[in-house]
Amino acid sequence: MKTVRVWFRKTGAACYISHLDLTHCMARALHRSRIPLWYTQGFNPRAHMVFALPLPLGMEGDRESVDIKIEEEQITEQEVQERLARSLPATLPVFAVTEPKMKPGKIAWASYRLRLEPEQGSAEELAEKLNALLAQPEIPVDKHTKSGMAHFDLKPYLGELSVSQEKDALTLDLFLPAGSEKNISPFLLTEALAAQQGAAFFCRSVRTNLYDADRKIFE
């Protein structure tokens, strides 16, 4: 038996698939691909699958992964990739299968790219509203937690935010805490921009990578 890490992208309309539905989709694809999987024991056996870090609904992912256990060690990573790629939709392309080098529990940071297109007005006007938000002494936001709603200041987490302006859009790149210890969604920033500055825009959001506490790329 061996564990392999399947790397895939979650693009286009797939960003609106919940994590539960993604799990079911992946399980069906694995079954169709006839990969010799290891199943859990008990009354309801299931294929062993461990996703690195679920994506929020509405967000795309450039470098997502799921760990699976394979019964036959003779099957190669390349063969797993080819079989699974044939069984998944075009919006969930598999681009690599590797041996896991880092446990998902080590994930501590994530990088994101947001593209904001104003519904009305110009990108320059939207940039002015973003700058006004960032100039506030605090950016108060509310976040759902296991114990209820938490109220906190988002501004200390935006120190690595970079903004580039195009003719018709803004592109935001940012690093935020992610993982089991602390998870700050980039949607908190866009929600604050809309609520506190009255900005109206379309947002395309992509999680580009995951990292450990030392900022080493999750592999």
Q: What is each PLM-predicted segment?
A:
Residues 78-88, 125-134, 188-190:
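Short amphipathic alpha-helices in soluble, non-transmembrane regions
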Residues 38-68, 101-104:
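Short, charge-patterned binding micro-sites
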Residues 4-9, 33, 66-68, 108-116:
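Short glycine-/aliphatic-rich beta-strand segments at the starts of folded cytosolic domains
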Residues 62-113:
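Ordered, amphipathic secondary-structure segments that act as subunit-interaction surfaces
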Residues 135-219:
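Core RNA-modification/binding signature centered on pseudouridine synthases
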Residues 101, 107-150:
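Extended, positively charged loop/linker patches that create polyanion-binding surfaces
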Residues 13-39:
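N-terminal ordered "arm"
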Residues 71-76, 119-121, 179:
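Helix N-cap motif at beta-to-alpha junctions
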